[in-house]
Swiss-Prot record:
Broad EC category: transferase
Role: Nucleotidyltransferase; part of the gene cluster that mediates the biosynthesis of the lipopeptide antibiotics leucinostatins that show extensive biological activities, including antimalarial, antiviral, antibacterial, antifungal, and antitumor activities, as well as phytotoxic. The function of lcsQ within the leucinostatins biosynthesis has not been identified yet.
Protein's name in the database: Nucleotidyltransferase lcsQ
Name of the gene: lcsQ
Pfam families: PolyA_pol
Similarity field: Belongs to the tRNA nucleotidyltransferase/poly(A) polymerase family.
Transmembrane region(s): none
Taxon lineage: Eukaryota, Fungi, Dikarya, Ascomycota, Pezizomycotina
Span of the transit peptide along the chain: 1-22
Length: 596
């Protein structure tokens, strides 16, 4: 079952789906891709292939195995090679020996003088061998050997087949054939092999024609595939958004099946959910993949989670029965708004002012993801503990194991949302007190000190405000400048509405909404309080106490705030004596034990 979309969103989705089906048709002709049976190896890859084949011959000659060793490079490396994407990570699949055993024999072989000479092995070409123990909670179902050779990161593992229990995503593993190994994988495009002995690509599941069609499909029945391992649902979303592929409709129809959603909620560790979500929200397309503004990989990933009804299986506390679920009907406004804002990186734009660094952009996408939870309060009658996290931060911590730094920003965004919104509205209405530099600057310092990233707290408030004020977020309106994404307005925006008079009503509403927030941020910049949290104090607590002739105490923090407010009112002053005098005059209010 898919979401019922508004007519405007349905039209946009048809455009986007059509675009994703046809993107890259020039760089990778479907006919050529469907019949591609070889790949072009780099010099380092050719060197590695020759070495590995020599190791196979030495093992076969020793008679340690019952059948000849056959090596295949598997999965993502093959997919990326066929797409023209460079990859330095190679999974090596072995037919008749464990990965650990083969890797040890290979490392021993690389110490032989003849091998060193024949393959040009330098003193730093072979790294240390690391055996990674079986760890099902982290999707390591077999012991794996890892080593770096010729600058390439190799993982060695045997071909296998899997058997799943109903109540676990951790399979029983046995040696298997190449076809059985391919069938157990999450998608046909990840089930391709490059046979080192024949030099050909082996396709047991139809992965080559699926790549030609830019399609993601499961090798086996999708319901069984996802029930066995519900993490595959999230992996397919990630691959579709990163590679700009679309998900096969038959596969897509099963992704929100109640059995799959329940398995995703309770059968899979939340750490693994967090890993996949982090990869989605940090998602970038490879340089070879052309990305249209509509199809930003992170925005597209959230859109797929939305359309496939996966939200409540991810952003949830699986240990508790849900007592309240946020309204998702306008969630699309939040992530579409953020994608639109980040598409305009011109100086002074909202996206530039509120998310300056790569880390800030990642946090911003997390905030967009949890926007439906941001205004949710604890149910009435629930006894709150001191410093208890709000529901949005609890969901992030328990649902996808968000780190403390991230939950702190979410909690602060929740607590300061109304205050931020009130200040923004006051600025837009021209309230005289908003011209007071100390009031605005101290508010910003307080937000930043209680969770950090005050700019991202403002961005979170903006996204929630967008969900509440705007019915839809038009992605395409009118052409922008060549240097800007289509439909991104110039910044700063005029506060007047004349620009929007002849536009579609939804576009006019969007532009008016952005105008208000741009006006607020322009005001912050004009007051020169954007960097208020990093302003250096003219004196610290010890110096203030010494000037007052008392010991530091509980009063110190409030008194230092008085000094900082004075600094904000007097930005050109470098002598703190008048600030100290103001503290002295307010000693009773501040609780300072002075004699006179």
């Amino acid at each position: 079952m898919l979401l019922r979309l508004s007519p405007s969103r349905m039209a946009l989705k048809r455009k986007l789906d059509s675009f994703l089906r046809n993107v890259h048709s020039q760089s990778a002709p479907p006919a050529a891709m469907a019949h591609a049976r070889t790949v072009r190896l780099s010099a380092r890859e050719e060197q590695l292939r020759a070495l590995l084949l020599d190791v196979c011959r030495s093992i076969d000659a020793a008679g340690d195995v019952t059948q000849p060793i056959i090596l295949r490079w598997a999965g993502g490396w093959v997919r990326d090679k066929l797409l023209g994407i460079e990859s330095h990570d190679i999974d090596v699949a072995i037919n008749a020996m464990t990965g650990v055993h083969f890797a040890q024999r290979m490392c021993d072989f690389c110490t032989l003088p003849d091998a060193i000479k024949r393959h040009g092995i330098g003193p730093r070409d072979v790294g240390n061998l690391h055996n990674v123990a079986r760890n099902p909670d982290k999707s390591k179902h077999l012991e794996t050997a890892m080593v770096k050779i010729f600058g390439l990161d190799l993982d060695f593992v045997n071909l296998r087949r899997e058997t799943y229990a109903d109540d676990s995503r951790n399979p029983a593993m046995e040696f298997g054939s190449a076809e059985e190994d391919a069938l157990r994988r999450d998608a046909t495009i990840n089930a391709l092999f490059f046979n080192l002995h024949t030099g050909c690509v082996e396709d047991f599941t139809g992965g080559l024609p699926d790549m030609a069609a830019r399609m993601i499909r499961t090798p086996l029945d999708p319901l069984q595939t996802f029930t066995d391992d519900p993490l595959r649902v999230l992996r397919l979303v990630r691959f579709a958004s990163r590679l700009q592929f679309y998900i096969d409709p038959a596969t897509q129809r099963v992704m929100d099946h109640p059995t799959v959603l329940q398995a995703l909620r309770v059968k899979i560790s939340r750490e693994r959910v967090g890993v996949e979500l982090e990869k989605m929200l940090k998602g970038t397309c490879p340089p070879q993949v052309e990305v249209h503004f509509w199809a930003q990989p992170t925005r597209r990933a959230l859109e797929l989670l939305d359309e496939l009804h996966l939200y409540h299986a991810i952003f949830t506390d699986p240990a508790r029965e849900p007592t309240e679920r946020p309204d998702l009907r306008r969630w699309h406004v939040a992530y579409e708004c953020l994608g639109w804002l980040l598409g305009n990186r011109s100086p002074g734009s909202i996206g530039t002012l509120l998310a300056q660094s790569e880390e800030a952009v990642y946090v911003a996408w997390n905030l967009a993801a949890v926007s439906p939870w941001m205004p949710v309060e604890e149910p009435p009658g629930v006894k709150k503990k001191a410093n208890a996290l709000p529901p949005v931060a609890v969901i992030a911590r328990e649902g996808f194991r968000a780190p403390n730094k991230l939950t702190d920003v979410m909690a602060a965004s929740h607590r300061h949302r109304k205050e931020i919104l009130q200040l923004k509205e006051a600025v837009c209405h021209g309230e005289p007190w908003t011209r007071q530099r100390d009031r605005c600057g101290m508010a910003i310092r307080r937000w930043d000190s209680q969770g950090g990233f005050w700019t991202l707290q403002v961005l979170s408030t903006l996204l929630v405000d967008a969900m509440e004020q705007v019915d839809s977020w038009p992605i395409v309106a009118h052409p922008g400048k060549p240097s800007q994404p289509a439909d991104v307005p110039e910044t700063p925006l005029s506060s007047g509405a004349s620009k929007s008079k002849n536009l579609d009503p939804s576009i006019a509403k969007r532009d008016d909404f952005i105008t208000g927030w741009q006006k607020f941020l322009d005001h912050v910049v004009e007051l020169n309080v954007y960097n208020a949290p990093t302003m250096k104090r003219l004196l610290d607590g010890r110096a203030l106490a010494q000037a007052l002739g008392v010991k530091p105490g509980k009063w110190t923090g409030k008194a230092l705030d008085v000094c900082m407010a004075w600094q904000l009112r007097n930005p050109d002053e470098t002598d703190p004596s008048k600030a100290i005098e103001e503290v002295r005059m307010r000693r009773d209010e501040l609780g300072i034990p002075l004699d006179g």
